[in-house]
Curated annotation (Swiss-Prot):
The gene is deup1. Signal peptide: none annotated. It comes from the Eukaryota. This is Deuterosome assembly protein 1. InterPro entries: Cep63/Deup1_N.
Length: 596
């Protein structure tokens, strides 16, 4: 746990240093960008000022030309308007004359009609009066309009005179502007030549600066990609490590649950056997009584035969027959009850043995799974060690030339190896036949039925040698160190039952201390069995010890890998610092030379 916390703290400190470095690099690049942008802006402002002057001169010339065109158009429009107005006035005068003629004719007709019908039709007179009034109003209106039109005609004649004078002055100004435009065009052509030369020089400098910027940005991006790849690999490795830890904890919990169930079943079996023994003792009591009764009857028969009296013998003969038949009947009933009890006991023991076998099979499966996980962890550690060796070799070869390229290759190899590691983790149990003979031997030992207690001493005396042979045959040098650490792999297992009980107590104490140091957050059950069940307890304790040693090995491997990755990250950070310093010094020298 402390090593994990230390590795996590180191990873966090490395990440903080990386972030600070990236922040410093970004600040330096931004400063350089700001300086270059200021220089470019100054050049652009100069170009824009010159362009503005040119555009202003062009706009002045265009405005003058436009004003001349507008004035010409106005003159043409005024001439056409005057001609049209004169035509309109003539038309209106003709229309007025025509209307006056019509009015005169109508007036004469009305006057004639009035004289005719003045006497008979008063209503017609009133109408004629109204029409006369309306006609007089119309005449007055036409007179007022004619006055206004005369005023407008005079005003337009004055405007025509003023426009003629303006046209003359504008023609003089146009000639002056044409002369000025020619001079401006000559100046513009000279300024354009100068500006084109300055623009070409500035563009060449801009291209060179942009190339330098692109190269620096590409190096920074490549470094950022490398850092992100390293971070992603570290995250994936931590996630896989956490998942393996969770799976190991789940398997340990299942193993403990199965061990508890097996302990409970064995305790129930032990109780049932004690009950059977008590029943057998109770059944033996009437058999002993029968034997005593038979002895007494034999003594009585001998005494009575010694007396030799036939009459008394005949009298007592039916009584003796009754006494002899009664114990025979009792013995027959007792034998029947014993057979029935034995059959019931056999059925109960068979059911309990089947449950125990099922539990042992489950325990065997769990141990197989744990061993499969050990195999995957071993493969992962081998691959990581191989990759680290390749990293060291490539680093020693390419340290002077191109370290970032070797790190990219290592990252690519790590990414290519990750799916193989996941495939090994997800492989079925059947693929682990090369490493799992110990598992099959353990399962076979669990599947064996339990013998009578009378042979328990012999089994205990034979067990250590067989277990040592199978263990040495199946597992190689990896498990020898664990075997030397375990306190129960001693030759004292084949001794008497008192020594076995002491050994079990020592094992329990050692396991409680070991579990409290390794797994302080878990409540692990103590492994304690009776002295008459020492065989099963040794098997289960050996399985638990192998799991604990595998877990300890996995933690050591993970801490070692974390430290190696920290070293790799530190080396990469140092290289990034060197690259950033070299780029900064390069740009500083370039900026100084440019200022010079």
């Amino acid at each position: 746990m402390f090593t994990n916390i230390h590795s996590i703290a180191r990873n966090s400190s490395c990440e903080n240093e990386l972030e600070e470095l990236m922040h410093q690099i970004d600040i330096m690049v931004s400063h350089r960008k700001v300086e270059w942008e200021k220089h470019v802006k100054v050049l652009e402002q100069k170009l824009e000022a010159q362009d503005r002057e040119l555009t202003e001169a062009r706009n002045l010339v265009d405005e003058k030309n436009h004003e001349i065109g507008i004035l010409c158009k106005k003159l043409e429009g005024v001439d056409t308007a005057q001609h049209e107005m004169a035509q309109n006035y003539e038309r209106q005068l003709q229309a007025l004359k025509f209307q006056l003629c019509k009015l005169k004719k109508s007036y004469e007709k009305l006057h004639f009609h009035q004289e005719k019908h003045q006497k008979n039709e008063n209503a017609a007179q009133e109408r004629s009066r109204c029409e006369l009034q309306w006609l007089t109003q119309k005449i007055e209106e036409f007179k007022a309009r004619s006055r206004e039109w005369e005023k407008q005609r005079v005003f337009y004649q004055d405007q025509l005179k003023s426009l003629d004078e303006q046209r003359k002055t504008l023609a003089e100004k146009c000639q002056l502007f044409q002369k000025e435009s020619l001079s401006y065009q000559e100046q513009l052509s000279s300024q354009k030549q100068l500006q084109s030369e300055a623009i070409t020089n500035n563009q060449s400098e801009m291209r060179r600066l942009r190339c330098l910027l692109d190269t620096s940005q590409e190096t920074i991006r490549s470094d950022g990609v490398i850092i992100e790849n390293l971070k992603s690999t570290v995250k994936e490795i931590t996630l896989s490590r956490d998942s393996l830890k969770d799976e190991n904890q789940q398997l340990l919990q299942e193993l403990r649950r199965c061990q508890k169930q097996s302990q409970n079943m064995e305790a129930q079996l032990y109780k049932a056997k004690l009950e059977l023994q008590s029943c057998n003792d109770l059944l033996r009591v009437p058999a002993l009584e029968e034997r005593q009764a038979q002895k007494e009857t034999a003594n009585l028969a001998n005494q009575k035969t010694a007396q030799g009296e036939e009459a008394s013998f005949q009298v007592t003969d039916p009584r003796m027959n009754y006494m002899t038949s009664e114990p025979e009947h009792k013995s027959f009933n007792l034998s029947k009850s014993e057979k029935y009890q034995a059959e019931n006991d056999l059925h109960g023991t068979e059911a309990k043995n089947s449950d125990l076998e099922r539990l042992r099979k489950d325990i065997g499966d769990l141990t197989a799974k744990l061993n499969q996980k050990d195999v995957t962890i071993a493969t992962v550690s081998r691959k990581v060690s191989r990759l680290e060796r390749e990293l060291e070799l490539k680093g020693a070869q390419n340290r002077q030339t191109s370290m970032p390229l070797s790190q990219k290759d290592v990252i690519a190899e790590l990414e290519s190896e990750m799916p193989q590691i996941h495939a090994v983790n997800k492989a079925p149990q059947t693929d682990s036949g090369e490493v799992d003979p110990w598992i099959s031997i353990k399962c076979g030992e669990h599947d064996k039925p339990q013998k009578h207690r009378s042979f328990h001493g012999e089994n205990n005396s034979l067990k250590p040698t067989n277990y040592a042979d199978t263990r040495n045959h199946s597992v190689g040098s990896e498990w020898e160190s664990e075997k030397s650490l375990c306190p129960w792999n001693t030759p004292t297992l084949g001794s008497a039952t008192d020594d076995d009980c002491d050994l079990v107590d020592n094992e329990n104490e050692w396991l409680s201390l070991y579990n409290s140091t390794l797994y302080p957050g878990l409540d692990l059950p103590p492994i304690s069995y009776a002295c008459d069940q020492l065989k099963d307890s040794t098997n289960s304790s050996l399985a638990g010890s192998s799991l604990i040693s595998a877990a300890e090995k996995f933690l050591l491997e993970e801490t070692r890998r974390a430290s190696d990755f920290e070293k790799i990250l530190n080396s990469h950070i140092e290289e990034m610092k060197r690259n950033s310093e070299s780029t900064v010094s390069r740009y500083q020298s370039h900026g100084q030379s440019r200022h010079i």
